[in-house]
Swiss-Prot record:
InterPro entries documented for this protein: Mitochondrial_sb/sol_carrier (IPR018108), Mt_carrier_dom_sf (IPR023395), SLC25A32-like (IPR044712)
Alphabetized UniProt keyword annotations: Membrane, Mitochondrion, Mitochondrion inner membrane, Repeat, Transmembrane, Transmembrane helix, Transport
Membrane topology: Multi-pass membrane protein
Example GO BP: NAD transmembrane transport
UniProt GO MF annotations: NAD transmembrane transporter activity
Organism: Dictyostelium discoideum
Pfam families (UniProt xref): Mito_carr (PF00153)
Mitochondrial matrix side: 61-90, 157-193, 252-296
Purpose: Mitochondrial solute carriers shuttle metabolites, nucleotides, and cofactors through the mitochondrial inner membrane.
Protein name: Mitochondrial substrate carrier family protein W
Main location: mitochondrion
Length: 329
């Protein structure tokens, strides 16, 4: 009798234990799903805020990048943009595709980056291959996230570039909207035409491969100096701006290569660029010198630094708000 009672108790204990494990697993899965949703929502909000504030500087930068005349300055470029029909509105050319591209870009980027970082950290903790919070983990996660984002959103950035450059003097204005642009490019240049500039974009993952490890490192340093207290807005601004400036200077030439490649439509002066990225690189250096690879970098730094500060600050605070109020959603 005692043996039967003991067996029954063991069975009940086993069932209860199994139920608890299932509940824990279910809770863990729900937590992970919520975390992914928080990352994506925070990324969307950050992209939206950055786009609204920095589109005019993006228009100036793109115009400088695709114009290979040697006498162009930031001020003369701004004047030529404002002198065209439309005036100040010209500074917001490409805002629609920018919003359409930026919002999913940051949603994909931040969620992929966080997922990869957590995955690699777990594997590293199991096998102790690298030190904790290794820069290699941050770099690899950033590169994978950057590549995924570039592949997903490349056609949108192509359309944004065409929207901006078709307004330049002597260009034919033929794109009326995002859908019309996509259909027109597909008919004239084929499916591959929608992915012009993807090669330089993938080369540009070097940018995030430098930026995100630096951002994480600066945050870690500032947190130590702050005695491990939560970072405030000033610390986030410092970490994001310094890491962005360094990464932008290191990886800038890919931006010029991408813009020239995306602008190589049939009626563009940049249609003369043929071949792969290396041949385009050599042609620019031969015809314009090394400075040609850094066209628009000054205005780019004026654009990306505040853009990065807005993006990362918005991201961190939206993420914090959603995490603290997860029971209300």
């Amino acid at each position: 009798m005692t043996t039967n009672n003991s067996n029954d108790n063991n069975k009940r204990y086993g069932i209860i234990k199994q139920q608890l494990q299932q509940q824990q697993q279910q809770h863990h899965q729900q937590h992970e799903q919520h975390s992914r949703l928080v990352e994506m929502t925070a990324g969307c909000g950050a992209g939206f805020m950055a786009s609204l504030f920095t589109t005019p500087l993006d228009v100036i930068k793109t115009t400088l990048q695709v114009d290979n005349s040697s006498n162009k300055t930031i001020m003369s470029t701004v004047k030529s943009i404002l002198d065209r029909k439309g005036g100040v509105k010209n500074l917001y050319l490409g805002l629609k595709p920018t919003l359409v591209g930026q919002i999913p870009s940051w949603a994909v980027y931040f969620s992929t980056y966080t997922f990869c970082k957590e995955l690699f950290t777990k594997e590293n903790d199991k096998h102790s291959l690298l030190e904790k919070e290794s820069p290699l983990i941050f770099m690899t996660s950033a590169i994978i996230a950057g590549a995924a984002t570039s592949i997903c959103t490349s056609p949108i950035w192509l359309i944004k570039t065409r929207f901006i450059t078709q307004e330049m003097v002597g260009r034919q204005k033929k794109y009326r909207g995002i859908v019309h642009s996509m259909v027109s490019i597909y008919h004239e240049e084929g499916f591959r035409g929608l992915y012009k500039g993807l090669g330089p974009s993938l080369l540009g993952v070097l940018h995030v491969g430098v930026q995100f490890p630096l951002y994480e490192k600066f945050k870690s340093i500032l947190k130590e100096k702050n005695k491990n207290k939560e970072l405030g807005i000033v610390e986030i601004m410092i970490a994001s701006s310094v890491s962005k400036i360094i990464a932008s200077v290191v990886a800038y030439p890919h931006e010029v290569l991408r813009a020239r490649s995306q602008d190589s439509s049939p009626d563009s002066p940049n249609r003369t660029y043929r071949g792969n990225i290396i041949q385009m690189f050599k042609q620019i250096v031969r015809e314009e010198g090394w400075r040609g690879l850094y066209r628009g970098m000054g205005v780019n730094l004026l654009r990306v630094t505040p853009s990065c500060v807005i993006t990362f600050t918005s991201y961190e605070y939206i993420k914090k708000f959603l995490s603290q109020n997860q029971n209300h959603f």
